[in-house]
Amino acid sequence: MALPTPTWARPIGLAFFFLWSLVAGAAANLHVSPVRVELAAGRASVALTVKNDGDTPTVVQTQVVAWSQQNGEDVYTPTNEVLATPPIFTVAPGATQIARVALRREPDAGRELAYRIFLQEVPGPPRPGFQGVQMALRIGIPIFVEAKKPQELKLDWSAHREPGGELRLFLNNVGGKHVQVYDLNISSVENAAPVYSNQSASYVLPGQRRSWLLKPLERQTLSGDRIRVKALTDTGRVETEIVLGKP
């Protein structure tokens, strides 16, 4: 059974933080590095460093899930293909704890595999007299397993105008590895000034498609049917020209 997709808070770097309302106390200040795990046939395990910058001990529970996408939405399912140890641990104030992530299967021959490890703060008892609401931190770290055969990044862009002046932009990842897009700027081929822009970070896994509905920037209009797409990704800058299609 697929796990429900959590409600995301604002991304910080490549790690995503979730705030869950729990009873009493203040959220611990946890920091995890690295913010992305990359495994391969010759690199089957990686150590995560968890640091507690708070003033109280913090109990952390780990969970690894398989990560896929459907209709542009993240889907998480239970898995035993990646193991996180220890599954639960306590980090003293100002101290660090090593959590190890280990691959328990062979990498896929022709496609990158994706998982996430969630590190969930387990709330302790409330301090005497506290009557507030505790915000428990949940950190999601992407895990990617490189395919046995090197994969190229292959992106297929398309777009069309919407009746209200918006632009519907599609990205089809036809390659065998993920891409993270965190900056989009769309302009006419004849004019470099951006007409549409989106700064949010989005992953598109291999074989998946994502779309953005973009509103025009103030006092900007798109001329002609040829547009230039510029994007920043986790593998570098992407720039391409496409012809607008029909809805």
Question: For the regions a protein language model found, what residue spans apply to each?
Answer:
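Asparagine-centered strand-capping/turn motif at beta-strand->loop junctions
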Residues: 50-54, 170-175
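Beta-sheet-dominated interaction scaffolds and their linkers
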Residues: 27-53, 151-166, 201
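N-terminal secretory signal peptides that target proteins for export/translocation
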Residues: 1-8
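Short aromatic-acidic-glycine turn motif
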Residues: 66-79, 126, 187-198
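Terminal connector regions
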Residues: 105-150, 219-247
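Short, hydrophobic/aromatic beta-strand segments
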Residues: 56-64, 178-185
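Bacterial N-terminal signal peptides
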Residues: 11-23
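Intrinsically disordered, low-complexity Pro/Gly/Ser/Thr-rich segments with frequent PxxP/GP/PP motifs
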Residues: 75-107, 194-220
